[in-house]
Amino acid sequence: MNKKLGHKDHFHFIGIGGIGMSAIAMALIKKGYSVSGSDLIQNKETKSLKTLGAIIFDSQIKKNIDFVISKFQDHTLNCVISSAIKDENEELCFCKKNNLSIKHRSEILAMIMNSYTSLSIAGSHGKTSTSTFLSTLLELCTHDSSSITGGIIPIYDSNAHIENTKYLVTEIDESDGTIKNYNSDIGIINNIDFDHCDHYSNIDEVLSSFKKFASNCQKLLINYDCKFTKNNFTSKNQWSIKESNNIAYSLIPNIINKDKTVGKYYEHGKFIDIINIPVPGLHNLSNITAAIAACRMVGVSFKEIKKNTESLKLPKKRFEFRGEINQRIIYDDYAHHPNEIKATIDLARLFIKDKNSSDREEKGRLIAIFQPHRFTRVKQFIHEFVKELSKADVIYVTNIFGAGEKNIDNIDSQLIANLIYKNNKNVTCLKDNYEINEKFFKLTKKNDFIINMGAGDCHNLWSILKNKNTLNN
């Protein structure tokens, strides 16, 4: 692992059920470390950790730390936190009072990365998808790859896969500025956008954070199609889905539909071959091109890559088909930034277009259900949210998921709905998933294509619906 850690170290995660925290915890267990953690919400990840031997508490009180200290008396206790953990957290306060070691999750992930040839995916959008595509290709092409990501990778059915391998694919979080803590052999920057207004004041601060990450990478792979990466970073390793001249890796689409994208693949301007991508959407094509480029940078043959692209799948909650209720098609997506909503609605339109062109029944509508995430993000991007959401045929906006933020400016979802109404009269504010469930058949009709978007707890809707309806999936 790292000289700073030994197997006499014990790790206690406050908020262990989070998708990123649980992945790091799983990695430590696989590496032989003892792990415990607490979370107020028990989920699939906490159950998996229990199965692997972790001690999981469903409360966050100082007695938990006392128990861990007594059970692992001959170990050095490391309390692991994310930026989401508040200063007043009882476990964290107890650790501080007793001068126990407190480490940010980024420090632990960085230490794990030191044992591998690391390929790290950073960027404002598409990190989890790109991490999934790269993990899948490296696994199938080399059988010598591990992964720690912020999403469930289909090939592993997990957010962490740790073995004694050469390569490690990691997803790097920029939201809190800890991106500077990582040293990577190959750093991949998908794109850069202004987001995370709770931490950054403007795009320049975001760029500064990414530049610190880039300076710590041995090699850098950047998206030529993003103006912020193109204009602010220098690297001979670039990818594009728009241009091939003087670009190291390009995949130019010529067939785009709801089932696949077919494109011409180039390296350094030279045509190599046609590639069939079984994942729709131009944003996904860009993410896959990044994964292909990274594989080529570590020496994977193009022949192996092409053969295994047919196995590529999106991670969970990324345009994920959930099922069908009485001829209403339902998808989930993690989109919570205006640009992500744009990409998701554009992709959904491909499905609507295909279905309506072949269906003699009443044409379906594109219904967008959106749970805004963070008051600061809504305040910063409200007009951009309105612009993109208005493009759906029908829009339902639920209460804002605060993610621990205080609503200082008294912002609510009705404000978003009122502005959307000026562009699209088919907009309604709803309280939550339970109200959607109660009114589901009044809110929808046969042949509707429903896309449920957000980064909060909105994806619990389908488990609520299944308790009342027959969900065919």
Curated annotation (Swiss-Prot):
Catalysed conversion reaction: UDP-N-acetyl-alpha-D-muramate + L-alanine + ATP = UDP-N-acetyl-alpha-D-muramoyl-L-alanine + ADP + phosphate + H(+)
UniProt-listed Enzyme Commission number(s): 6.3.2.8
Chain positions recorded as ATP binding sites: 123-129
GO molecular function ontology, one term from the record: ATP binding
GO annotations of cellular component type: cytoplasm
Subcellular compartments: Cytoplasm
SUPFAM superfamilies xrefs: MurCD N-terminal domain, MurD-like peptide ligases, catalytic domain, MurD-like peptide ligases, peptide-binding domain
Family: Belongs to the MurCDEF family.
Protein name per the record: UDP-N-acetylmuramate--L-alanine ligase
Native organism: Prochlorococcus marinus subsp. pastoris (strain CCMP1986 / NIES-2087 / MED4)
